[in-house]
Each structure stands twice: as structure tokens, then as C-alpha cells.
């Protein structure tokens, strides 16, 4: 059964090497990134696993959306760039899965055009993302989000 605690993510009140697994969804880009990674390493057992999904700051459409929607942002928000991805590599053995290049804009269009989200446009966008990720790996950095799966070094 999970237990929930409210505390400073930069100074967790858990013992060293306490957790087997640490999960986060769109949280790291709101924190002092290196301090947060250090704290995750501290509370994670050797060989412990991480799973994070975070926005990428490299995507030009994402940059435009952030510029056009400042009311939906917080001052501490810093989507991940190459530097942050390399900081992860220093502490964890990771695999990265990139998602949402075409699926975001075409998903929005799909929501306007169709009542049912399971339609040809949504499927096309999803399959385009999968294909581009496989066939043109350098494009992965232009995707909107990254899913990071890793093990503590």
C-alpha cells in the first residue's frame, strides 16, 4: 500500500539507499535539476531503477507553445535540454524513449475534427512518431517528451 509524504524534493527525509524504485512524471524540470538528481541517487539503492517522463525543451513547436501560453507556465519550469540528458547519464545507466512529435499537433486537430479520439488521424500521428523515431534517430531530440528508464550506477 503506498504512503504519501509531502516534503522538499531537494532534501528528502528518507535514509540513504532506501528505495528500489523512483518514479516521476513531469517533475524534474521544475526542480534544481542537479540537486534533485543527487537526492534521487542518495535515496535509491545501488542498482535501483528510475522511470521519469519529462518535457524536452528542444522541440520548436513546444517552444512556441510555451511562448504563447505563459499563463500556463511556472517560473521554475525548464524543459530538459542536451545538458540535462547528459547529467542523467553520469548517474544512471539509461534508455530514452522519445514521444510526441506529430501526435501533439495532429491530436489537437483530431479533437477538433472527430468525436472519437480513436480515429485515422490519431493513429497516423502515432505511427509517424514511431517510424521517425526508428528511421531517423537524430530527430528524436525534436520530440516533445522523453521517457527515461534507468538503473543507478
Task: Annotate each PLM feature.
Residues 26-30:
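A short His-aromatic
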Residues 1-15:
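Conserved SAM-binding strand-loop segment of SAM-dependent methyltransferases
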Residues 98-153:
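A C-terminal cap/extension of S-adenosyl-L-methionine-dependent methyltransferases
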Residues 23:
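A conserved beta-strand element that flanks and buttresses the S-adenosyl-L-methionine
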Residues 77-98:
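Short alpha-helix
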Residues 49-76:
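Conserved class I S-adenosyl-L-methionine
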Residues 35-49:
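A short glycine-rich, Lys/Arg-flanked "PGG" loop and its adjoining helix->strand segment in the class I
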Amino acid at each position: 500500500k503506498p504512503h504519501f509524504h509531502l516534503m522538499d524534493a531537494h532534501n528528502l527525509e528518507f535514509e540513504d539507499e532506501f528505495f528500489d524504485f523512483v518514479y516521476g512524471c513531469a517533475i524534474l524540470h521544475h526542480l534544481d535539476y542537479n540537486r534533485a538528481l543527487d537526492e534521487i541517487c542518495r535515496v535509491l539503492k545501488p542498482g535501483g531503477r528510475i522511470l521519469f517522463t519529462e518535457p524536452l525543451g528542444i522541440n520548436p513547436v513546444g517552444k512556441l507553445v510555451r511562448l504563447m501560453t505563459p499563463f500556463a507556465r511556472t517560473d521554475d519550469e525548464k524543459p530538459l535540454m542536451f545538458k540535462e540528458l547528459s547529467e542523467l547519464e553520469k548517474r544512471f545507466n539509461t534508455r530514452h524513449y522519445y514521444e510526441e512529435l506529430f501526435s501533439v499537433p495532429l491530436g489537437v486537430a483530431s479533437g477538433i475534427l472527430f468525436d472519437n479520439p480513436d480515429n485515422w488521424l490519431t493513429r497516423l500521428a502515432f505511427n509517424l512518431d514511431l517510424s521517425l523515431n526508428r528511421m531517423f534517430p537524430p530527430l528524436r531530440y525534436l520530440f516533445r517528451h522523453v521517457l527515461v528508464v534507468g538503473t543507478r550506477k
